[in-house]
């Protein structure tokens, strides 16, 4: 490994790192019931701030994770954010003032902030960074020189060799020698600076490429040593470095969880999920961070992503309902090019526009955050499955969820542990009555879910269900279809997908050829809508004619009786 002589600058840097220590560090793991993180991938800080106020706080998210804030190489590709040039807060997503404003705004909304932190390596190539800093590989003036890099100056090529994985270069990026005291102190100074700006924790990028002992030593210099860390350590069977090595430093992302969800939802039966978690060989629940997809896996294809339709949505519903790990809800943007950077340079003018997917705000997912918070600490109870892709389970006496991943409606009497009374199905906005014995009868349309919890007793105010003034539009359309086709509706409201065919809502064919769906909408809302059909491959065909129009009444549900226009 490289060695650097002790100098006066080292002493000064170490002192600076100590001086920067934040007085109030975050806890070692997400505390309390609010353990869900919204990962707003490549969102500008100003847009993150608005999301904290408008959607994340009200939905009950505990954390928001922001993309790497440090200065990086020039370029529009998303991965430029992961090639640091300096530790100035001067990337494409915003400057230091914008970052601080975002943190303060999110805190005011009750949302803590996690910063994606790139500390394993520096940029390759040469040029001028986004903050004006000149650099070339191995030389980053005022920060690093070649003496601070590992001696291996070639790319990683053998994941069965620990030294190769941790001392050589990840895709040719300059590998920092994190075993050296100066390097540890300088990295800690950067993280402590983020703490002083109000950050509550860190996602450590490429943790697997740094020895666990090095990360432990760095963390000891950050805050008071108990700051929340979530580490990226990808599992690979038979590899020399395993994710479990990092459990002593903080939480570790359990990549097998997401891979297995894809396999089960696409090729197996949901009934297999009955003991999902540690019984599958995963790391301990209390130390694991889980996700359906992240920015790498959605592009690499080893997990589900937004292109997988209801399978993706229902996997998210399951993750948020199931008591394993601390969930990350990835919220990114549409892509066809693997390298494409964020629309508008990261500015989100509105969800579901300009390619922004806003998964964190999808009603099917955001409604489950409140359920998860309500059911925190409750065990899985009253499991039911049909042996295939229809499952249901309770969370003690606090919640109950049913998921229908089949092509026909699920209609049955469910046994829950819920107290008797009225509940709002936060997935559909419909009222459900639970008997004194915990049973209730309901229909769950194909490709949808049902979710009840004690924090949402009514659909017209109270709890965490739809708020005061909420009613619904009941869509009924007579439409004949070919085998494999389904009918959807979309329109100019967020609840209707904002004209995005990928976010269109699937109607229930239980009364075929009449397709039905109830959608919660605020009383008095005027809206436009239109029906479309999708085949098994997801190809969409719109009905003909102009946009349909309607207005929700001030009381009661609006019923629409339509006929498909060929």
UniProtKB/Swiss-Prot annotation:
Write the Enzyme Commission number(s) for this entry: 3.2.1.1
Q: How does it assemble?
A: Monomer.
Report the co-factor binding details: Binds 1 Ca(2+) ion per subunit.
| Name the record gives this protein | Alpha-amylase
> What CDD domains does this protein map onto?
AmyAc_bac_euk_AmyA (cd11317), CBM20_alpha_amylase (cd05808)
Is-annotated flag, keyword Hydrolase?
yes
Q: Which family does it belong to?
A: Belongs to the glycosyl hydrolase 13 family.
GO process annotations (BP): carbohydrate metabolic process
- Where's the active site on this chain? 205 (nucleophile), 232 (proton donor)
Question: What's one GO MF term for it?
Answer: alpha-amylase activity
Residue ranges annotated as transmembrane are none
Q: Which N-terminal residues, if any, form the signal peptide?
A: 1-28
The CBM20 domain sits at 465-566
Q: Which reaction does it catalyse?
A: Endohydrolysis of (1->4)-alpha-D-glucosidic linkages in polysaccharides containing three or more (1->4)-alpha-linked D-glucose units
């Amino acid at each position: 490994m490289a060695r650097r002589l002790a100098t006066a600058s080292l002493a000064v840097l170490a002192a600076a790192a100590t001086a920067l220590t934040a007085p109030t560090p975050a806890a070692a793991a997400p505390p309390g019931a609010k353990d869900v993180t919204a990962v707003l991938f490549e969102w500008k800080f100003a847009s993150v701030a608005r999301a904290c106020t408008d959607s994340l706080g009200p939905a009950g998210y505990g954390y928001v994770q922001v993309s790497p804030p440090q200065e990086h190489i020039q370029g529009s590709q998303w991965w430029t954010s992961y090639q640091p040039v300096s530790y100035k807060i001067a990337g494409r997503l915003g400057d230091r003032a914008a970052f601080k404003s975002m943190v303060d705004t999110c805190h005011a909304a009750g949302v803590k902030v996690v910063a994606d932190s790139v500390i394993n390596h520096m940029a390759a190539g040469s040029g001028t960074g986004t903050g004006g800093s000149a650099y070339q590989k191995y030389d980053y003036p005022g920060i690093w020189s070649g003496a601070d890099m590992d001696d291996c100056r070639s790319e990683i090529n053998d994941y069965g060799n620990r030294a190769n994985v941790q001392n050589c270069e990840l895709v040719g990026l300059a590998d920092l020698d994190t075993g050296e005291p100066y390097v540890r102190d300088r990295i800690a100074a950067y993280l402590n600076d983020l703490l002083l700006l109000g950050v509550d924790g860190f996602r450590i990028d490429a943790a697997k490429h740094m020895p666990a002992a090095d990360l432990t030593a760095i963390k000891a210099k950050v805050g008071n040593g108990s700051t929340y860390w979530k580490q990226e350590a990808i599992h690979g069977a038979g590899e020399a470095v395993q994710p479990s090595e990092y459990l002593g430093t903080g939480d570790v992302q359990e990549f097998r969880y997401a891979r297995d969800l894809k396999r089960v939802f696409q090729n197996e039966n949901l009934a297999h999920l009955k003991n999902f978690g540690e019984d599958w060989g995963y790391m301990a629940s209390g130390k694991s961070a889980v996700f359906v997809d992240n920015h790498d896996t959605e592009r690499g294809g080893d997990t589900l992503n937004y292109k997988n339709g209801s399978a993706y949505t229902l996997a998210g519903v399951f993750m948020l309902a199931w008591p394993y790990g601390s969930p990350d809800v990835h919220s990114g943007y549409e892509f066809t090019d693997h390298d494409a950077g964020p629309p508008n340079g990261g500015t989100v003018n509105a969800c579901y526009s300009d390619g922004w997917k806003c998964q964190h705000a999808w009603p099917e997912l955001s409604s489950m955050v409140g359920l998860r918070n309500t059911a925190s600490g409750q065990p899985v109870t009253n499991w039911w499955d049909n042996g295939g892709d229809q499952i249901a389970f309770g969370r003690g006496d606090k919640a109950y969820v049913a998921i229908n991943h089949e092509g026909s409606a699920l209609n049955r009497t469910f046994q829950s542990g819920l107290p008797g009374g009225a509940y709002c199905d936060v997935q559909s906005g419909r009222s459900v009555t639970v008997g004194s014995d915990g049973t209730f009868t309901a229909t769950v349309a194909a490709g949808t879910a049902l979710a009840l919890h004690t924090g949402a007793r009514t659909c017209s105010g109270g709890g965490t269900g739809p708020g005061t003034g909420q009613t619904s539009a009941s869509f009924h359309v007579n439409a004949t279809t070919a085998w494999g086709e389904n009918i959807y509706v979309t329109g100019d409201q967020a609840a209707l997908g904002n004209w995005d065919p990928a976010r269109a809502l699937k109607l229930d064919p239980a009364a075929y050829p009449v397709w039905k769906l109830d959608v919660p909408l605020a009383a008095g809302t005027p809206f436009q809508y239109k029906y479309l059909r999708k085949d098994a491959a997801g190809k969409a065909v719109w009905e003909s004619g102009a946009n349909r129009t309607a207005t929700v009444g001030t009381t009661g549900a609006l019923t629409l009786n339509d006929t498909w226009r060929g």
